[in-house]
A protein has these predicted regions:
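TPR/TPR-like alpha-solenoid repeats
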Residues: 25, 44, 62, 99-102
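Structural motif corresponding to the intra-repeat A-B loop/turn of tetratricopeptide repeats
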Residues: 28-29, 59, 65-66
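Boundary/linker segments of alpha-helical solenoid repeat arrays
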Residues: 9-13, 46-53, 81-94
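N-terminal topogenic membrane-targeting module
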Residues: 1-19, 24-28
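Amphipathic alpha-helical segments of tetratricopeptide repeats
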Residues: 2-7, 36-45, 77-83, 87
Length: 102
């Protein structure tokens, strides 16, 4: 079933994941709109460091497309610290390579 009003239907952490998943779906089509959901998810809180790292990595990608290099660098470094199993190592390295070209 579709959640019509997440603020009243879900607890804070669930709202965080609701926004996180919404952001992931939107990142395929509309990065600018996805940015809003990722920021809200981080603000509300996510339980797993991995999820937080993915959200920050996506935000870094948005910052890069908008030519905000400093913000992208900070978000990438935060994502790298949160990525304890090195699952995002390849994506982080790729994004840092793209930054060098800017």
């Amino acid at each position: 079933a579709y959640i019509k009003n997440p603020e009243t239907a879900l607890v804070r952490k669930q709202q965080g994941y609701f926004n996180y998943l919404h952001g992931i779906m939107l990142s395929q089509t509309n990065l600018i709109q996805a940015e809003k959901y990722f920021k809200k998810a981080i603000e509300l809180g996510l339980n797993m460091d991995m999820d937080l790292a993915v959200a920050k990595l996506n935000l870094a990608g948005v910052a890069l497309t908008r030519r905000r290099k400093l913000e992208a660098t900070n978000l990438l470094n935060e994502a790298k610290k949160l990525d304890k199993q090195n699952m995002l190592k390849e994506q982080i390295t790729m994004m840092k390579e793209q930054m060098k070209k800017m």
